[in-house]
Amino acid sequence: MVLIRVLANLLILQLSYAQKSSELVIGGNECDINEHRFLVAFFNTTGFFCGGTLINPEWVVTAAHCDSTDFQMQLGVHSKKVLNEDEQTRNPKEKFICPNKNNNEVLDKDIMLIKLDKPISNSKHIAPLSLPSSPPSVGSVCRIMGWGSITPVKETFPDVPYCANINLLDHAVCQAGYPELLAEYRTLCAGIVQGGKDTCGGDSGGPLICNGQFQGIVSYGAHPCGQGPKPGIYTNVFDYTDWIQRNIAGNTDATCPP
């Protein structure tokens, strides 16, 4: 009964935000070339595989499950086939994953902090996105973006990033859809109650931006993508700001919150 009440309230919230929402990431609209200056594309020997967020000239935040033994990061990218004059490529110098992470659980502390081998220079298509100053609230309008699949079942990867607006949902919605989502995991639940808008395969590690603040990291979701009862699950960035700042300051022994 409680869940039915939650879903009813969220549907009302969703309808109130409908006019603010763009088209779908899945089957939807190309991002404006100037709205993702902080978006990082991860490539390895097989090609593009994850996204990330530039938070200052030397540091990138992504998902822990995007870790790979051999990868590069490209910034200033829009089309993967058309070179921007200010694109920059970097290698990871150091990688930080929560030392108290349970490696058998992808949803547990799914965050990775990367120090670049060389600072990034701000340019027309490159600029960092600051860490959040406050936590997000349920009902917030959130922006998702990435080069992930734009079709929900058979993966179709675009050359350009796609964007959409979704809403931050009550955590109970995701707990109902994902029995494996434990209450202690520091995650956010975001999507559309009636389905159809979602991040998908290849969007992992990219940002969830709520009311202009970097609040989440694409972590986990259902297949096919875009199912209303199973919204996307995002690592809650605000809960890790202290850990991020301590590592940037040189305290590499810092532990993440439990």
From Swiss-Prot:
Tissue: Expressed by the venom gland.
Glycosylation sites: N44
InterPro entries: Peptidase_S1_PA, Peptidase_S1_PA_chymotrypsin, Peptidase_S1A, Trypsin_dom, TRYPSIN_HIS, TRYPSIN_SER
Enzyme class name: hydrolase
Record domain Peptidase S1: where: 25-249
Broad class of the protein's primary localization: secreted
Regulation affecting activity: Inhibited by NPGB, leupeptin, aprotinin and PMSF, but not by EDTA, SBTI, heparin and hirudin.
Active site feature: H65, D110, S204
Complex formation: Monomer.
Family assignment from sequence similarity: Belongs to the peptidase S1 family. Snake venom subfamily.
Protein task: Snake venom serine protease that has fibrinogenolytic activities. Also possess esterolysis and amidolytic activities. Selectively cleaves Arg-|-Xaa bonds.
Protein name in the entry: Snake venom serine protease Dav-PA
